Amino acid sequence: MKINPTTSGSGVSTLEKKNMGRIVQIIGPVLDVAFPAGKMPNIYNALVVKGRDTVGQPINVTCEVQQLLGNNRVRAVAMSSTDGLTRGMEVIDTGAPLSVPVGGATLGRIFNVLGEPVDNLGAVDTRTTSPIHRSAPAFIQLDTKLSIFETGIKVVDLLAPYRRGGKIGLFGGAGVGKTVLIMELINNIAKAHGGVSVFGGVGERTREGNDLYMEMKESGVINKENIAESKVALVYGQMNEPPGARMRVGLTALTMAEYFRDVNEQDVLLFIDNIFRFVQAGSEVSALLGRMPSAVGYQPTLSTEMGSLQERITSTKEGSITSIQAVYVPADDLTDPAPATTFAHLDATTVLSRGLAAKGIYPAVDPLDSTSTMLQPRIVGEEHYETAQRVKQTLQRYKELQDIIAILGLDELSEEDRLTVARARKIERFLSQPFFVAEVFTGSPGKYVGLAETIRGFQLILSGELDSLPEQAFYLVGNIDEATAKAMNLEMENNLKK
């Protein structure tokens, strides 16, 4: 059911008329609050604690009701630090779930989980707000069209293409390039598609959040002169926040994206970095609420929590939300319950490989582990499908031969296998690409490669037309013409050395 956003906003002035309770217990970020008989707040209602701490500093903490304990008590999780709270403090029931600002006023701004601006650029128009908890669109409202979303990144567009209005997961351990890939996608999509994006920073590094903001201002995604012309809204609940904020910040970002889809009827991009931190925060809250842990210590409600978020990220007849989610894989174990639960919801998976990153091949996307439901001849066409399959077959054969090469050496292979290995090594290097957002680190200008150019390049390598070129000519270039030009430059350099 579609819920129309409220235009009232839960202002402080209206709080005084609500139910009043008192704190009876504080355990870290969890509060137990006693209310008068018959005046219990509902589950997910926002509670506000206002007062002064022992030093006289004002306190304003918002909590969310999670459990009704009996004996007129509720258990709530705080969305900010509980420092300075004491037993007996007054708690106000707002009578509604957390609501956040939505619409054009959010563009170019940074918000916290409560929808409060944290970028020191003044207040935001809060006349139009929307509750962060709502049901997913009904089946009859969903759109089922299938079309490809071009990213300009060769390995993605060829081997695991993204669906417009789909859900994409970037899987990888620590330090293999998930955040850089997300930043490149934001950059390419803002330039090539001109769409509106919402970025949800869930439990990641504050430094990365700041870097992303500065990067967006430099690239023009956020318009410094006229903020309203910006193309992105940012919502952060970073590593230093309590688990309640990290658990709900994804819903805040999603609520803003839903408004652009349902009311403005736009195609929206929702970036979540990192969806694992959403699960991790849920696990922390679950333990604090006293629930019995499930497999590997995760919360027993893992699938339900993930489903309630993911099912709202969808395309309706009004507009679409294409979601790109970074998924941290603990200890590089894809069978861990958190990444395994996420897999079930995705249309495409981009798996980042530590082995490729160690070889210096960036983006370190594993061409054999990455998958997409879109890679079918009826969707992408015969030419694209055939090229992708032949690339995968060549790389798979190279993988099978690696043990033999390690033991016996290249010379022991048949002529055909040696040719396969040579082409596979060229393909592996041609799958690398210089990024716009990494220019400052590498000094190489970024490249956007169209799908047609990508297919043409790999067809030329597979056909054997470029067998004479050295493999380093294919490393960190854009299209195939740049590779041939680089080969000529390398040849000239070698001749000069002689």
Curated annotation (Swiss-Prot):
Gene Ontology MF terms in the entry: ATP binding; ATP hydrolysis activity; proton-transporting ATP synthase activity, rotational mechanism
Catalytic activity: ATP + H2O + 4 H(+)(in) = ADP + phosphate + 5 H(+)(out)
Native organism taxonomy: Eukaryota, Viridiplantae, Streptophyta, Embryophyta, Tracheophyta
Official protein name in the record: ATP synthase subunit beta, chloroplastic
Pfam family, one: ATP-synt_ab_N
Role played: Produces ATP from ADP in the presence of a proton gradient across the membrane. The catalytic sites are hosted primarily by the beta subunits.
Enzyme class: translocase
Record keywords, A-Z: ATP synthesis, ATP-binding, CF(1), Chloroplast, Hydrogen ion transport, Ion transport, Membrane, Nucleotide-binding, Plastid, Thylakoid, Translocase, Transport
Entry GO terms, CC: chloroplast thylakoid membrane; mitochondrion; proton-transporting ATP synthase complex
Keyword Membrane: yes
Annotated organism of origin: Coffea arabica (Arabian coffee)
